[in-house]
């Protein structure tokens, strides 16, 4: 079921490949649309799987300063997003206080990164560089000491030495990098950034200007210096601290780096550098404005024509900055850029509008996803595929439907990523989109296919986006001449969609709707009922303005001052618990909004602080606040959000179903094998053994990136097929959690209770061939949270500069926290009044901060037993160093854990906008039972972090969750019924009035719930009580069955013959035999074993496994294309 705005409305039904209308399973006929928008004409995206366009390039996942420090972002976030390329500053560069190439390189390359670009001019502290003027020869740099000597690269002013100053800078930064990097061959060096703008060589596109001629000369000189230093390390003349030598023929160099496409200047550079043998390896320019969505392809084609004209081998291209503030975090916007760049096979990096370390606003909080992150995750999943031709009805246009499509022949999977469907309102609400696919090869997909469509809604740059929901399903659809149409209604232009086609599977994918506890509804804040001063504001759709964030629905609610209210009259689809989410932004500080349901107070939304350091961000940089509403009943309810003195502005509200309210799991999400990221030999299997669509681990790995709203325990249920004794390993966020051993042959499940981090968790399954995974399901298990060991920071043993700080305006628990861990920055209140936290770190002109190093603060806790833990730190960080024209100069802070003198863990902790606002960040730690001391022992300049000032974040609390709780819980493989007098062939007898005691044994031993339910096939012949005691009633034969409560498909039984007192007992087995009988799942006896013991190749696994597509396939001859009838995301507009 898709999101509904305000109420569920049956909508358009999808069209099958044969163009026949088919009905969603279990849903009635569609009714008339409730609003005019829902009668919007269908928009079509044409995907030709018969025309491949090359190997998937993956370059559109690039970032400029996407990484802030090692661990910022986290591994799960970084690996999930599969960032292919990022540009960072040089070692010890001063342009920004974080994002040092040497600090981030190992984490980047360990998590799917392929290429690091270094902006060499970012050595300078000022923007524009050197005051915007080309340097001359006024300095002498110290170059005659080791590159890691503190004096190396320092300079003396007013000391000309007959050498261009920037040439010396290039030598300094190249030596600092090559003396320390572990990945020289994967680094690209860019000597100039925006030379056409404010950085030294501005001439517009006039390639004849004297200043541009100077640029051509300087390009050749810079090229020569970079190659000189490279060759010194390659030859061994100079050495690297890690013993790593460059192996490539030459250093990779990128340029020119212009701020826009400059045709004349670019052609002149190609001509000049070809003649001088200094051609760039990577051609670089920016595509920042929304006009690039229509003009980029012409720029690309013109550039390629220059290469052809000049006889130059095609160069790689990196669009080193793309997009506007309004594009970041918005799936329906980002996909438009991705489609252009992937189709032309170039790298492209999102622009750096705000701060480093959050993937350019494409993640949320410390470790959570926003809508942008999920799109990057989907895009990263396409590695190893081939792209195919995609044609939009709106080619080369701004803000319209676009997509990327690929075919994975090894895994027999076709994927389409799309979004951006728009109309004259510039909102694009409720537009039906048909993905028209042709060329689907029957040799790959067979005669019939399954389709899944997932929806990824916009939640703001810092608003949490949960796992995208399945909103459209097609099962066992016959292909007609390789053609298939799938129609899904798009919620709005901001949303993104993932469509996956596979051969028909034995893994059924269900719609995420009220029936399985996964419904979702949404409403624009401005469409709620406003009262007591709250006001709706109409906003621009942001076209043509790079400096504005996106406003969902082109509006929001402000003037939300004390007592103001917005009320959502919502039709709840089913009884249960629901999570209300408010997409909102205060002015830089945290606070609360009160929440009422039908006039009754139900608690507060804890609204987090958000970025407010500049006009473009204040009240516009939206995050999210959540509260669970327990016990909502089906039907209409009024949910009211009431303002306090926080004065936050709000964009939209969402209502997520948490559970069905009938004891079903909380926050349950299923990830089928076809949605997993397979690597190192793991592959989707289609061999006809009842495991079609399962992931055969095959010695490789299958990764799931699972969302959790909060830190704590989750049940991870793995459904799989394997031979008895086969095993595989479950790891969570890089930590081994459990080795799972198959307890029987065939289909089964195992459950591991694991401590999750708040946000994204990387679950990895690794095992041998023959272990075939159908799905992984996660569900909250909060009852185990009591196993965690929690410390309030102020209760720890403090020393040095550590001190307890009380702040009633903070969102720290108890309004107290510990500050002063590690070194301490010297700060003052110098920020602009009214724009968030005014605290600034004192720093010199080079952004070097003043640090107190003589009183390192620590906090020590005891009582944590030896073991592996997910350590959750609730922290704050308001460190802000220096100034910049548009980038907040924030930094990550480091926290380390020591046991005795041994460091056992460390982490980077992001900027939280103010010391008053606390976030959660997890660090994996293994202890030996001793006292644990937390602080920061890094020495200034140690390069253990991008900014190694030895300063730690403020700490509110620390919670240690053991990685797992309990042993692996396996599924029931069989039920055996036995008892005195039961024969080997499962028969027993007794007389009327007599009793017989039966026992039921549930296997394997690792089953958690071994209770059974006893039943009699005819209680007029014999009854059985809850303890298995059978009593004869009258003569006859009856079957007594014990059914597993944990798995009702598993049972065992015996046949009991009841005789009158005068009758002779029938022969059939020795009464002293005490034989046992294992019943089949259908209750049959006769000495046959249950299906779980029949072996993986018995052919019966599909019949009895609960995760097959049998139920859907049984709808004879009907292909179900779920594209409507209340199952799609609807937006009910209340204004024109």
UniProtKB/Swiss-Prot annotation:
EC number(s) given by UniProt: 3.2.1.215
Catalytic activity: Hydrolysis of alpha-D-Galp-(1->3)-L-Araf disaccharides from non-reducing terminals in branches of type II arabinogalactan attached to proteins
Chain ranges of the BIG2 domain: 987-1045
GO molecular function: carbohydrate binding; hydrolase activity, acting on glycosyl bonds
Domain CBM6: 521-656, 669-779
Residue ranges of the region described as Disordered: 1049-1104
Membrane topology annotation: Single-pass membrane protein
GO annotation, cellular component aspect: extracellular region; plasma membrane
Organism this protein belongs to: Bifidobacterium longum subsp. longum
Protein name: 3-O-alpha-D-galactosyl-alpha-L-arabinofuranosidase
Highest taxon of source: Bacteria
InterPro entries, A to Z: Big_2, CBM6, Galactose-bd-like_sf, Glycoside_hydrolase_SF, Invasin/intimin_cell_adhesion
Keyword Cell membrane in record: yes
Similarity field: Belongs to the glycosyl hydrolase 39 family.
Database matches in SMART domains: BID_2
Additional note from the record: This enzyme increases the growth of bifidobacteria in the human intestine by using the gum arabic arabinogalactan protein (AGP), which is commonly used as a food additive for emulsification and stabilization.
Transmembrane segments: 1109-1129
